Swiss-Prot record:
Name this protein carries in UniProt: ATP-dependent 6-phosphofructokinase
Involved pathway(s): Carbohydrate degradation; glycolysis; D-glyceraldehyde 3-phosphate and glycerone phosphate from D-glucose: step 3/4
Source species: Actinobacillus pleuropneumoniae serotype 5b (strain L20)
Record keywords: Allosteric enzyme, ATP-binding, Cytoplasm, Glycolysis, Kinase, Magnesium, Metal-binding, Nucleotide-binding, Transferase
Major localization listed first in the record, in broad terms: cytoplasm
Gene designation per UniProt: pfkA
Amino acid sequence: MAKQIKKIAVLTSGGDAPGMNAAIRGVVRAALNEGLEVYGVQDGYYGLYTDRVIPLDRRSVSETINRGGTFLGSARFPQFKDPDVRKKSVETLKKYDIDALVVIGGDGSYMGAKLITEEFGYPCIGIPGTIDNDIVGTDYTIGYQTALETAVEAIDRLRDTSTSHQRISIVEIMGRHCGDLTISAALASGCEYIIVPEKGLDKESLMRNIEDGFNKGKRHAIIAITELMTDVQALAKEIEDRFGHETRATVLGHIQRGGAPCPFDRILASRMGVYAVDLLLQGHGGRCIGIKNENLVHHDIIDAINNMRRPFKEELFEAARKLF
């Protein structure tokens, strides 16, 4: 029989994403309405290790649903891989008699929750919060749609100036090893070429595509590429040297993580926050939440990390490619 849950904690970990505050709010208010006590862990797993734990009430999350970032703070804490660090972190939970933990973040955050679940049998629920949309078991992650809107707006602005100056523009978009954000942003803004990790960078194919565009009468081009694939400044120079056409690279960078979350992310985050509390009250632990075909689902967090594979958006990529 599962232990009765009386106190829970929530933390945000890894890179911030618009909608994290809405998810925290969802967890806190749903838990309070069920008669639970709620604590917030500041600065992610680092705060768990250093005992940065604060009580949360309804006022703590008032006026946060529309705010970007995470008011609890976040941090990357690779030291959490050390078993002694994890042991001390769990002692912090025990100090406050916390019965369960909700973790909002990406795959690194899930790994921390997985280890706490495996090693200490602690009920953890993972909520996917990352603009990269690279978490398995869910169609969308919290923050992705807002980041997409930000990227599209930036590309639209770049197209204005690229058109005016007959310039080739390379736009580097976040996503790490997942091309979802790049593909969707490129499709929505009519980019002439897309380069994503799942397909790799074929420079000769890129050059042929640019040349074909010029032969068809195009006077400018926008190339969307996922971060970490190549030095975009060097690529811009290669293209300019090849065609004698002014080429500039723009790295959108961390601006994609900021700003107020869009309505989709606010709704998704709120639903997932409520669902996390429901799962804990039902006796679930070691689960991660997702959304599939508009329905909330949950998976074993260990299985999600070890065995599940995120499908590549081939249809979207091909649709965008046919519109070059």
